[in-house]
Amino acid sequence: MERKTQTGYLVLADISGYTSFVAKTEIEHADIALSYLLETIVEKIGSLLTVSKLEGDAVFCYCAADNIPEGKSLLELVDQTYLEFRDKAQDLYAHATCDCKACKAIPTLDLKFIVHHGDFIIQQVAGIKDLLGTDVNLIHRLSKNHVAEATGWHGYALFTNQGLEKMQTDKKSFIQQTEAYEHLGEVETYVMNMHARYDGMKGV
């Protein structure tokens, strides 16, 4: 059966610090905190995008480009999702009722976004949908990048050139960075600091 190629936005919202958080803390409380934060991301980001699946510490979403007529809507979604995530994480920490390592380590968690625009195919097997394609592979490869190494940021949004071009967003407020991957070559990306945007939204 031939599957139709679709074009649209691909978005990955990935909790930074997840691996060390789980490895160094009590798994029961870590699971509760992470589930709560993942639910927060899904609820917010799912208001505009279709959630494809949860990938451990990440939420993978997609949306046909026609469903987002203005690029600023996607940028606002990233802002609002990050705002909600940070607020909920701080609330969790403030209301923690124990001194376990998991509760103490909540402030080490952060959120990064990878945004791309490209082609994908929706595969359905036994009622389970999955996205396939080179651009799907690319966005997942981009989650392993040099942003934190180059900037010190752990909460950020990384957009590919294709993503920003489709959004028609001014690139002046972003830091340009090139990533390179085997079989995919060099990828032009643009990054913004979500901590700074969070402070701006909070009026700090």
Predicted regions located by residue number:
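Alpha-helix/helix-capping structural signal
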Residues: S16, G118-F120, Q162
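Extended hydrophobic secondary-structure segments that form protein cores and membrane-embedded regions
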Residues: V11, D110-H116, Y156-Q162
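Catalytic strand-loop-helix junctions within cyclic-nucleotide turnover domains
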Residues: C63-P69, I114-K129
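Catalytic NTP-binding/metal-coordinating core of nucleotidyl cyclase/transferase enzymes
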Residues: M1-Q80
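Alpha-helical scaffold within the catalytic cores of cyclic-nucleotide enzymes
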Residues: I32-S47, A65-F113, I139-S143
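Catalytic-core segments of nucleotide cyclases and related cyclic-nucleotide turnover enzymes
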Residues: Q123-S143
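Intrinsically disordered, glycine/charged-rich C-terminal tails and inter-domain linkers
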Residues: A148-V204
